[in-house]
Structure formats: C-alpha cells, structure tokens
C-alpha cells in the first residue's frame, strides 16, 4: 500500500483522510493522469495487476498493461488488484487494493474518496472556467480554446460529438459523422465540436454533458441554439 500512496502523492493526488480504506478509493477528473499512474505502478512493481471497466490497453511486448475487467477472474493469487473506472461495473471490495474512477462522469453512485485530484492535464483553463460556472470543480495550468457557436451556422472542426436523439437525427440527415456518448468514454481528441439542443446543462444529464465537454485537448466548440450556453 505504501508504494501506491507514495505514487499518488508524487502525482499530485490529495489525501482526504488519515486512515486509508481498503480498497483505497481514488476519485479524479478527466485528464488527471490516472491511466498513466496505473501503468507506472504496473511497470515498477510486479505485484500489481490492473483491470478496467473502460477501454483496456492494447497488447504490448512487456505484457504489463491495463486489462479488461472481464479478465479479473483470472487475476493471480496474491496480486494487488487495481480497478479502473470502478463506477462502471460490479466488483468485490474485499479483493481489491485500489479503485480509480470519476463519479462525476457516471450516473451511478460514487464512493467516499481516500485521494482526489481535480487538476486536468488534458484541456485548458478556458474549458475549466466554463465547467466551473456550472458547479464542477476542475482546474488546469494549460491554455485551450472554448467557443460557443450557433447550432446551424457552425462549421464542425475535429471530432463531432452528440448524444441527444433529436440532435443525432439532424446530424444524420446532413451526413455529419459523429461520436455518440457510448463510444467516447476514456477517449481524447485534439479538437471537438459538441452539438446540443440545450442552452444549459439539465441536472439529470450532468454526467452526459460532462463527458462530452471533456474529450478535447486543444479546442472545444459548443454548437447550440442561438449560440447561448450558460447556467440557467
């Protein structure tokens, strides 16, 4: 456990309580570097095994990678097991060393955290300012571009994302290729154009909007009615 705690501290994860639970629960924002941290643990200490309910790592020469959760039943006896994207599946706490996740992106319940990180290395301060205006807590030291444009006047750039059925129908009629919400979790794109029929974030859709607004690295364009997107 000391290896894990020291690694979390060195990667700017903040401890929330003195007594760390078992499993150790780590909640973090998109782009906090959790996947990189997990891979570093795997490569530095052979006792660790990692399994994800998100997108698993591709096979590599070393054989040390984040595996799909479907292979959890094959974990070696005595391994220190890490669960990634813990909010997205079922697992037995008694068998787990640590669990990483982002309850803000999930509609399911989160767990009280032992460590947290609200600093993202993925996108920049302009997007963070927008998100914080809606009550999220996230910050960044890099710069990015965050624009709000009219739904029918915008020229899509980069990867197009949409999840509302009426929006997807419009995009399909105009032969615009797009990513749906079911395909974007854990993914990052250089630029994103997010199409929405809303001018704000409905409370019951906070998790979905948060996912769509946090997939980019350099530029986010929000295409919405009347080019207005702000807290209601």
From Swiss-Prot:
Domain (+)RNA virus helicase C-terminal: 118-232
Keywords: Host cytoplasm, Host-virus interaction, Inhibition of host innate immune response by virus, RNA-binding, Suppressor of RNA silencing, Transport, Viral immunoevasion, Viral movement protein
Domain (+)RNA virus helicase ATP-binding: 1-117
Pfam families, per database record: Viral_helicase1
GO molecular function: ATP binding; RNA binding
GO BP term, example: transport of virus in host, cell to cell
Major localisation: host cell
TM ranges: none
Cross-referenced InterPro entries: (+)RNA_virus_helicase_core_dom (IPR027351)
Subcellular compartments: Host cytoplasm
Cellular component GO terms held in the UniProt record: host cell cytoplasm
Function, as annotated: Transports viral genome to neighboring plant cells directly through plasmosdesmata, without any budding. The movement protein allows efficient cell to cell propagation, by bypassing the host cell wall barrier. Increases plasmodesma size exclusion limit. Acts as a suppressor of RNA-mediated gene silencing, also known as post-transcriptional gene silencing (PTGS), a mechanism of plant viral defense that limits the accumulation of viral RNAs.
Misc: TGBp1, TGBp2 and TGBp3 seem to act together for cell-to-cell propagation. TGBp1 is the main movement protein that physically cross the plasmodesma with the viral genome. TGBp2 and TGBp3 would facilitate TGBp1 function.
Subunit comment: Homodimer and homooligomer. Interacts with capsid protein. Interacts with host AGO1; this interaction targets the host protein for degradation, thereby suppressing the antiviral RNA silencing.
Family designation: Belongs to the Tymovirales TGBp1 protein family.
Protein name from the UniProt record: Movement and silencing protein TGBp1
